[in-house]
Amino acid sequence: MTETTALASSTVSSAPLSLDLIITCADGLEAPLQTELTSFGIASEMKSTGRLAVTGTLRDLYKICLWSRVASRVLMLIKRKNINAEYDVAEQLYGLAKSVNWTEQFSLEQTFAIRLSVDKRVAVSQQFAMLRIKDAIADTFNEVYESRPNVDSKNPDFSIFATVNDKQAELYLDLSGTSLHRRGYRVAMTEAPLKENLAAALLYSAGWHQKNEAGDAPFYNALIDPMCGSGTFIIEALLMHCDYAVGIDKAANQFGFYEWQHHDAALWQEMIDDAQTRFRAALEIANEQPDTLPLIFGFDADNGAIIATEKNLIAAGLQDLLPLLDIETRALDQLSTLLKPLVADGRLSNPLIITNPPYGERLGDEEMIKPLYQSIGLILQDSFAGSGVDPMLGILASHVEQVDILPIREPKTLRCHNGAITVYFRYGTLIAGQTGNLVNRFEKREIEVEDGQDFINRLQKNLTRLKKLAKKDNVSNIRVYNADLPDFKVAIDLYGDYAHVQEYAPPKTIPPETAKKRFNLALMGIREVFGINREQIFIKTRARQSGNDQYSKQGNTEKRGKFYIAREDGAYLYVNFTDYLDTGLFIDHRNMRARIKDNSRNKSVLNLFAYTCTASVHAALAGAKKVTSVDLSQNYLDWGKQNFALNGLNVSGNKYQFVAADIFEWIKDNTEQFDIIFIDPPTFSNSKKFQGTFDVQRDHAALINRAMNRLTADGILYFSNNFTRFELDEQLTERYDIVDITQKTIGFDFDIKKPIHQSFEIRHRQSI
């Protein structure tokens, strides 16, 4: 059988040692590790998953242990031997271990431990095989000293790794000691922290280590981590930039080669001294010439995470750089407010945006994961829209589907592990966002339509007029047609790139064939005027509703179940064109939501009959100190939570509340006071969850009176409803200060002469 001995010399000699090394790393990090080793001037080749082979010198060994940011361990091959798995494998392992002169590796006074990895094709007791290797080492020492070193399985001076498959067995000495990923700076932690060497590997993958074309400055001029946790990406990026040898902190006593017989203490100290000198020099340059340091931004919605980041920066020896960094408590929804001015003045000319969002195990609620990742993409696109800057974006996720929705051009994906969790790193250039409103994109195209020219002309006239107004107000969702012509009874709403068409059920006097022909003509006209494909048009038939029918799911459709994203006044909102009669966004209340937004800063806001919480989102984005959304439907509240997450708003705390309850009962039992209350009830409801029925004309006075008990003395209650024959109870006008604001809340795309809703601003009467 073939045997290979990796270290032939028995004593320290003047000739350089030739070491066969295995450099281990987490699965998936082989390429970044190889990139790093190449930068050290060390050639390597892939041996297997998570293992790179290196033939090097003692200096190479020390360099890897001292400087590698990606490696986990450095193992030195002691001996390799072919085996026959059909025979006694444990005894073959004993023979292999017995053929090694262990006294050349460590002394009698030092402790050791055995680790064994057995291929599943090999039938052997792992515990017994480890015992036989230990026996061989003990026998070797007994033959020389008549004594043996002790075993310490928890904290040994030397760890011996053995691997065996059906053809070969190998013995390694762990010269790295404790895992190389431990930097020593993590004195404060947050939930599910990112491993240090994984963070470094991802920074390598994204190109953080690269220089510009001239080679005299970093390739990236900034690093942004919008959800920085305990600051691992930030710290690793700074350590990389400042030429810090990550093994320095371990140099005191934690490397496995310190008691090794071939350790060259003088060479090691020389390399330590050089590393410390390089780090001090880099820090000095960064402090004296701040422009040489890339801009570093670390944000998190959790102030505890920011405190942890600052503590870890200090522990990493980077305290002198703290004044040069922007580390602050900032929620994701506030990110674009900071980035846009920096992009505009050119300070973010080539940034790397890299982050580890609270995916899966960190977030807990799977329903919030997709909106969170979508929000990151949308917010960043908005921040860099129209700037000509193409930032690099790198994001981790626990499932590849989560990062599939990110707007990245020619994306690359790295499958790796953060501890025991499989994660995916998606990185590439951010696809630039679009400026301006979306309505202006619609351009007419010629389609042969035999009849229906009157409809086409009216639709074109409406669109031409409304596009100008939409551009002026930066509006993307509008109603362009509402049964303007008697033969074409449809309502057409534009949501960004999509048309939502509602056909009013024709009267019985119109033959079905005639109604169908007219509707098909309308669809052809829509395609011609808007220049869109059939897939961008969603159709519903609107008949008189009873009870909660408008909130019930509709019949089967090929496009059912898909959510689209609408933009409105700085907010992103999910809409569904297929599953319900309504889309989740009442565009006739656009001005009302803007009114609530304008008055919500530092206010407590209550949204009753909240539906999908669109008004709540606007209040939260405006800086409301608390927003409570109450609705009878948990499904719609869940939709509302996703709207919050889509805008980077954290729903896990107490700031934003979502309450599924009977509105009348809730405002009767709840005693909290609110600065702003918004009520937009249905015209009629007889839900099984509701106690009795609700009729807005009959019950609005009682509803408003109860709600006013929850309104602060100087607060505002906004009341709106869509009942066309609604009349406000006169007793309310006698009791409160009420202003009809209908004309101010009806948008430019609705007929003010036939208001689709009525709205009122209600306050407590002030004592004179």
UniProtKB/Swiss-Prot annotation:
GO MF annotations, alphabetized:
23S rRNA (guanine(2445)-N(2))-methyltransferase activity; RNA binding; rRNA (guanine-N7-)-methyltransferase activity
Intrachain disulfide bonds? none
SMART domains the record matches: THUMP
One of its Pfam families is Methyltrans_SAM
* Record EC number: 2.1.1.173, 2.1.1.264
The record's CDD domains line, in alphabetical order, gives: AdoMet_MTases (cd02440), THUMP_AdoMetMT (cd11715)
- Among its keywords, does the record have Methyltransferase? yes
User: Which InterPro entries does the record associate with it?
Assistant: 23SrRNA_methyltr_KL, DNA_methylase_N6_adenine_CS, RlmKL-like_Mtase, RlmKL-like_Mtase_CS, RlmL_1st, SAM-dep_methyl-trfase, SAM-dependent_MTases_sf, THUMP_dom
- Give the UniProt keywords, A-Z: Cytoplasm, Methyltransferase, RNA-binding, rRNA processing, S-adenosyl-L-methionine, Transferase
Coarse class of the protein's main subcellular location: cytoplasm
**UniProt domain THUMP: residue ranges:** 60-175
Q: Which NCBIfam families match?
A: PRK11783.1 (NF008748)
Q: What does this protein do?
A: Specifically methylates the guanine in position 2445 (m2G2445) and the guanine in position 2069 (m7G2069) of 23S rRNA.
Instruction: Tell me what this protein is called.
Output: Ribosomal RNA large subunit methyltransferase K/L
Q: Which organism is it from?
A: Psychrobacter arcticus (strain DSM 17307 / VKM B-2377 / 273-4)
The gene designation is: rlmL
